């Protein structure tokens, strides 16, 4: 179906007590407005118009890559006025979906139902029934059909008893919407142009108004303060955790798991508590993720174990690998397979070959390490001279002793052995043994100092 979307995002968000525009506050690591934009894009919106006001420069910087038309609402004169700012860009013969940048959990399924439910020439609007509707506009029906929406401040005592409320989300044809917007008046307690008044205008024209309920009521909850944002964050994470559990992923405690991107898992994946997933993460079969790990834009292949408190970003972990605890794999790190990096090891733009291991206290940067290599504790690839980065190449079956500095650019040939405490600043041939430390000396008769009285 062809439709365009208008997203209202001009509010200041006073109750957030922040210099950040309200719709840029993040939920699951993504600005609230982007959640709504992505949902519209996934549904195939032909155009997305974003109506902004406060913090416009910041919004355009943060959302610079989004497929939206920017519509300025210089004065905040109500929701009807906000939509009217975008009217010149709305096609007469296209459905127009009106959404809100601070209602981030609205789903594609709910919006599809709403678009499908729109009567010919009429309006479809999203409503919910609340036990406590205080503060919301009430849905006024007459013998069944919706005839009007009355805002809380303008409602009579009888109307305040109504429990069906307006969410603000609606769809109408572009031509009709523009005509109705032109008839709005600001004769109300707020002195604003209410978008909701078009319901009564449409009814007076004999147009049908259809009310639709969301798939899940949490979808239409908005955010005005940090308490509400935190509540939606937990609701979102609970939904993501439930989906993963249904797919066979074992989350040891679903309430202590955060998904801030997309996660693809194989079978028999186990994720311990307080794990954070960001960006696009792919996990193979029979993988264990330990407590406190952070995974971002990475791939972990079958039968690998990520031990607690490891951080993996932009890296690839091959099959049958062990990582951690307390390992950091930075962008460009690759463990080929059956390899091991242990506690306090950091890798960046480096490849660790099959069967190789760096078990302790090591930095590997811009390094290409072959198969079956042992990297001793305290080894550092010195890849940076203050201006440029240089590469370290280590062949297969090399043994690097503890506390070794490899000053790049440098090559270590296959089967070479480097003794502990070495500083290597030249290439080492295949099979060579290199020892750079001075011989140990013994001082006979030496005595420790005695504290003077």
UniProtKB/Swiss-Prot annotation:
N-acetyltransferase as annotated region, ranges: 248-453
Annotated S-S bridges: none
Subcellular location: Cytoplasm
Cofactor(s) demanded: Mg(2+)
Binding positions (UDP-N-acetyl-alpha-D-glucosamine): 8-11, 22, 73, 78-79, 100-102, 137, 151, 166, 224, 330, 348, 363, 374
Entry keyword Nucleotidyltransferase: yes
InterPro entries: Bifunctional_GlmU (IPR005882), GlmU-like (IPR050065), GlmU_C_LbH (IPR038009), Hexapep (IPR001451), Hexapep_transf_CS (IPR018357), MobA-like_NTP_Trfase (IPR025877), Nucleotide-diphossugar_trans (IPR029044), Trimer_LpxA-like_sf (IPR011004)
Cofactor notes: Binds 1 Mg(2+) ion per subunit.
EC number: 2.7.7.23, 2.3.1.157
Annotated pathway: Nucleotide-sugar biosynthesis; UDP-N-acetyl-alpha-D-glucosamine biosynthesis; N-acetyl-alpha-D-glucosamine 1-phosphate from alpha-D-glucosamine 6-phosphate (route II): step 2/2; Nucleotide-sugar biosynthesis; UDP-N-acetyl-alpha-D-glucosamine biosynthesis; UDP-N-acetyl-alpha-D-glucosamine from N-acetyl-alpha-D-glucosamine 1-phosphate: step 1/1; Bacterial outer membrane biogenesis; LPS lipid A biosynthesis
Complex and partners: Homotrimer.
GO BP annotations, alphabetical order: cell morphogenesis; cell wall organization; lipid A biosynthetic process; peptidoglycan biosynthetic process; regulation of cell shape; UDP-N-acetylglucosamine biosynthetic process
Residue sites binding acetyl-CoA per the record: 377, 383-384, 402, 420, 437
Record organism: Photobacterium profundum (strain SS9)
Region Pyrophosphorylase, annotated ranges: 1-226
PANTHER family assigned to the protein according to its UniProt record, in alphabetical order: BIFUNCTIONAL PROTEIN GLMU, NUCLEOTIDYL TRANSFERASE
Chain's role: Catalyzes the last two sequential reactions in the de novo biosynthetic pathway for UDP-N-acetylglucosamine (UDP-GlcNAc). The C-terminal domain catalyzes the transfer of acetyl group from acetyl coenzyme A to glucosamine-1-phosphate (GlcN-1-P) to produce N-acetylglucosamine-1-phosphate (GlcNAc-1-P), which is converted into UDP-GlcNAc by the transfer of uridine 5-monophosphate (from uridine 5-triphosphate), a reaction catalyzed by the N-terminal domain.
Enzyme class: transferase
Region (Linker): 227-247
Catalytic activity: alpha-D-glucosamine 1-phosphate + acetyl-CoA = N-acetyl-alpha-D-glucosamine 1-phosphate + CoA + H(+); N-acetyl-alpha-D-glucosamine 1-phosphate + UTP + H(+) = UDP-N-acetyl-alpha-D-glucosamine + diphosphate
Annotated binding of Mg(2+), by residue: 102, 224
Keyword field: Acyltransferase, Cell shape, Cell wall biogenesis/degradation, Cytoplasm, Magnesium, Metal-binding, Multifunctional enzyme, Nucleotidyltransferase, Peptidoglycan synthesis, Repeat, Transferase
Gene Ontology annotations for the cellular component aspect, listed alphabetically: cytoplasm; membrane
Protein name: Bifunctional protein GlmU
Superkingdom of origin: Bacteria
Family according to the record: In the N-terminal section; belongs to the N-acetylglucosamine-1-phosphate uridyltransferase family. In the C-terminal section; belongs to the transferase hexapeptide repeat family.
């Amino acid at each position: 179906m062809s439709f365009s979307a208008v997203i209202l995002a001009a509010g200041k968000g006073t109750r957030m007590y922040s210099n950040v525009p309200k719709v840029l506050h993040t939920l699951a690591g993504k600005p609230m407005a982007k959640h709504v934009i992505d949902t519209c894009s996934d549904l195939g919106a032909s155009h997305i118009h974003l109506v902004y006001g406060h913090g416009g420069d910041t919004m355009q910087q943060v959302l610079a890559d989004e497929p939206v038309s920017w519509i300025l609402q210089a004065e905040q004169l109500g929701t009807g006025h906000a939509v009217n700012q975008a009217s010149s860009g709305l096609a007469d013969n296209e459905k127009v979906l009106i959404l809100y940048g601070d209602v981030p959990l609205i789903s594609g399924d709910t919006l599809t139902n709403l678009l499908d439910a729109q009567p010919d020439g009429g309006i479809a609007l999203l409503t919910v029934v609340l036990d406590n509707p205080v503060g919301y506009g009430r849905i006024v029906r007459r013998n069944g059909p919706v005839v009007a929406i009355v805002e809380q401040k303008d409602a009579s005592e009888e109307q305040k008893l109504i429990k069906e409320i307006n969410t603000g989300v609606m769809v109408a044809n572009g031509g009709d919407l523009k005509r109705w917007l032109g008839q709005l008046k600001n004769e109300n307690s707020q002195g604003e142009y209410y978008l909701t008044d078009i319901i009564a205008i449409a009814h007076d024209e004999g147009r049908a108004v259809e009310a639709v309920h969301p798939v899940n009521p949490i979808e239409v909850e908005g955010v005005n303060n940090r308490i509400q944002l935190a509540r939606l964050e937990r609701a979102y994470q609970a939904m993501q955790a439930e989906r993963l559990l249904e797919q066979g992923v074992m989350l040891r405690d679903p309430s202590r798991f955060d998904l801030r991107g997309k996660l693809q898992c194989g079978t028999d994946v186990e994720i311990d508590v307080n794990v954070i997933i960001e960006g696009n993460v792919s996990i193979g079969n029979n993988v264990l993720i330990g407590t406190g790990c952070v995974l971002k834009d990475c791939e972990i292949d079958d039968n690998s174990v990520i031990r607690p408190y490891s951080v993996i970003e932009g890296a690839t972990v091959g099959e049958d690998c062990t990582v951690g605890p307390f390992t950091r794999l930075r962008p460009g790190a690759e463990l080929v397979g059956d390899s091991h990096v242990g506690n306090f090891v950091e890798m960046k733009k480096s490849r660790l070959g099959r069967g190789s291991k760096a078990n302790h206290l090591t930095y590997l940067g811009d390094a290409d390490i072959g198969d079956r290599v042992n990297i001793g504790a305290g080894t550092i690839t010195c890849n940076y001279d203050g201006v440029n980065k240089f590469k370290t190449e280590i062949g297969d079956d090399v043994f690097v002793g503890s506390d070794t500095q490899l000053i790049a650019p440098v090559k270590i040939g296959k089967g070479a052995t480097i003794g502990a405490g070495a500083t290597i600043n030249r290439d080492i041939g295949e099979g060579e043994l290199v020892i750079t430390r001075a011989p140990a000396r013994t001082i006979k008769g030496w005595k420790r100092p005695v504290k003077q009285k």
